[in-house]
A protein has these predicted regions:
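Alpha-helical bundle regulatory/interaction domains
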Residues: 1-183
Length: 185
């Protein structure tokens, strides 16, 4: 019988966004690592779309393309990547929000190429400080999985409401990148 509680040391949950947000957000994901003290989970992430990760207890160290591991800020924005990212995580929880190119364009006027293959502190980088309410949807202590997810979705709905400049052009780019006829770009 399942109790609904995660088994083992790592629980990773994915949530599809509501249909109105799917052109902008790939998924929301919640990672929780259980353990004692400095027990570490280590892994590598494949190249991916841009994303925002909120790590309330700053329990994740990461590096890109073989670079040194650094302790990530509480809210980290990552541009699209073409390299692997190596990470180590201590017990704690985090949320991630995968961003499609139009999602990035609606959340920031910063060109993605300025953030490609790197991360920035979303709470101090001037291009992202307006995301404070979104980052604040995940408190230091757990507010409960459903409550945090719903708070993130409320903030995303507000932030993604206005079209971005050149959105039609960005959509054509997205469609080309996700066309199943092409296997590499």
């Amino acid at each position: 019988m399942s109790t609904g509680q995660p088994s083992g040391a790592v629980a990773l949950r994915f949530f599809l966004p509501p249909k109105r947000l799917r052109p902008f957000v790939t998924t929301l994901y919640h990672l929780e690592i259980f353990g004692e003290g400095d027990e570490l989970v280590e892994d590598w992430l494949h190249p991916e779309w841009a994303n925002l990760r909120i790590i309330p207890q700053r329990t994740i160290d990461a590096g890109m393309a073989g670079g040194p591991l650094e302790n990530l800020p509480r809210a980290v924005i990552v541009g699209p990547t073409s390299v692997t990212a190596h990470f180590r995580a201590r017990p704690g929880r985090s949320w991630g929000i995968g961003l499609m190119p139009r999602g990035w364009a609606r959340l920031s006027q910063a060109p993605t190429d300025e953030y490609a293959d790197r991360w920035a502190d979303a709470e101090s980088d001037p291009a992202f400080t307006h995301l404070a309410a979104l980052c604040g949807a995940v408190p230091l202590e757990s507010g409960g999985l459903a409550a945090e997810r719903d708070a993130l979705l409320r903030e995303l709905t507000l932030l993604l409401a206005e079209p971005a400049a050149r959105e039609a052009e960005i959509l054509r780019f997205e469609e080309a990148l996700t066309d199943p006829r092409f296997h590499s770009v």
